[in-house]
Amino acid sequence: MKIGVLALQGAFREHINMLRTLGAEAVEVRKAEELAELSGLIIPGGESTTITKLLYTFGLAKPVKDLARNGMPVWGTCAGMICLAKELSGDISGVKTLELMDITVRRNAFGRQVDSFEAMLKVKALEGGDFPAVFIRAPLVEKTGQWVEVLAKLPDGTMVAVRENNLLATSFHPELSADNRFHRYFVQMAKDYKP
């Protein structure tokens, strides 16, 4: 089983390292042919305008969409969540998403870099207590479609982790925590995938 991490820009190395600590074969993905034989794909945090532009420039958008629509697990963290969203609100200039997940997302919802924070989250899908979530210029989910499951909210009710079938999205950066439970959860999604 091989899990790819989109390596065009952003925090891809941290995801690779976390996956490898779990014994998963993790590979960097920069070209469409590198999507072959994957059991899952992570779209990391970074700069959403840059990542979405490069997805289309390098011819990755269509094959990623096709694989996701055929059931391959795809997880977007922070900017990756923005990439997966069907709709964006607020300043969306320069961002063309993959329009895969039935969510409306607001970019940079918590402010600038200096407004970054950590929070302990109760996550439905994870056992073992609260999860330490790192938010850096994070988006938030404003609205979900009928089939989207909300996995975690901040104490004020803000949705920050969601799943729709084979699609997973988090506003925060699990790869920047020492806690590997979210990655373990995604590895299990990848193991369950039957192409």
Curated annotation (Swiss-Prot):
The active site is at C78 (nucleophile), H173 (charge relay system), E175 (charge relay system). Pfam families: SNO (PF01174). InterPro entries: Class_I_gatase-like, PdxT/SNO, PdxT/SNO_CS. GO terms for biological process: glutamine catabolic process; pyridoxal phosphate biosynthetic process; pyridoxine metabolic process. Transmembrane segments: none annotated. GO terms for molecular function: glutaminase activity; pyridoxal 5'-phosphate synthase (glutamine hydrolysing) activity. It catalyses: aldehydo-D-ribose 5-phosphate + D-glyceraldehyde 3-phosphate + L-glutamine = pyridoxal 5'-phosphate + L-glutamate + phosphate + 3 H2O + H(+); L-glutamine + H2O = L-glutamate + NH4(+). L-glutamine binds at G46, E47, S48, R107, I136, R137. Keywords: Glutamine amidotransferase, Hydrolase, Lyase, Pyridoxal phosphate. In the presence of PdxS, forms a dodecamer of heterodimers. Only shows activity in the heterodimer. This is Pyridoxal 5'-phosphate synthase subunit PdxT. The lineage of its organism: Bacteria, Bacillati, Chloroflexota, Dehalococcoidia, Dehalococcoidales. The gene is pdxT.
